[in-house]
Curated annotation (Swiss-Prot):
Function: Required for genome encapsidation. Forms ribonucleoprotein complexes along with TGB1 helicase and viral RNA.
One GO term describing the cellular component: ribonucleoprotein complex
Region of interest (Disordered), ranges: 1-27
Family: Belongs to the potexvirus capsid protein family.
Organism per entry: Potato virus X (strain Xc)
Main location as per UniProt: virion
Biased composition regions of type Low complexity, renumbered to the chain: 7-27
Descriptive protein name: Coat protein
InterPro entries assigned: Pltvir_coat
Keyword Ribonucleoprotein listed: yes
Locations listed in the record: Virion
Amino acid sequence: MTTPANTTQAVGSTKSTTTTTAGATPANSGLFTIPDGDFFSTAKAVVASNAVATNEDLAKIQEIWKDKKIPSDTMAQAAWDLVRHCADVGSSAQTEMIGTGPYSNGVSRARLAAAIKEVCTLRQFCKKYAPVVWNWMLTNNSPPANWQAQGFKPEHKFAAFDFFDGVTNPAAITPKEGLMRPPSEAEMNAAQTAAFVKITKARAQSNDFASLDAAVTRGRITGTTVAEAVVSLPPP
């Protein structure tokens, strides 16, 4: 492909001048290269998500865990145990880990989580292993412990953990056999609804007053009430 050009000839002259048209597309090279079918069939994309811990994050966490004397041959199991525990208790920054898992050489889950938070969020780490925990829970028919407290129906109970969307994230680590079954549309809807409720309640507990004058606050410490914060969802 050649660069489009504008050929003009001066009046009273036999000499032609060639000028490049402003804004013309340069030759098919560099950043102006146009992909063809071969590219799409052969190119390899590295899947990454800012919602999921990266492989670089895992490498850093692994080194910290080594310093804490977590055995290399059970390190993966220690991670899976921690994430399975988070499916029960939550993966927010405020969540308190309970006890010590059987694969961490006596290092508590709280210390494992603290090491993770030096590199990424606990939820990002949990989403990395969400497919592993999903299969684990289904295999043992053991849903997240707090599914009833969160208001989930029995048929949606396996979706009752706050990093559920990591189960289908392509950046997560999936077992060799794949998912035992994909999450159903009803489970995904239930998980999204639970997340919405948590966010709404959290916002209702925050102070959104622009003034501390009693005429504005009416003596309330928090801002918007739960009833005011809830947005009515359209009927199905």
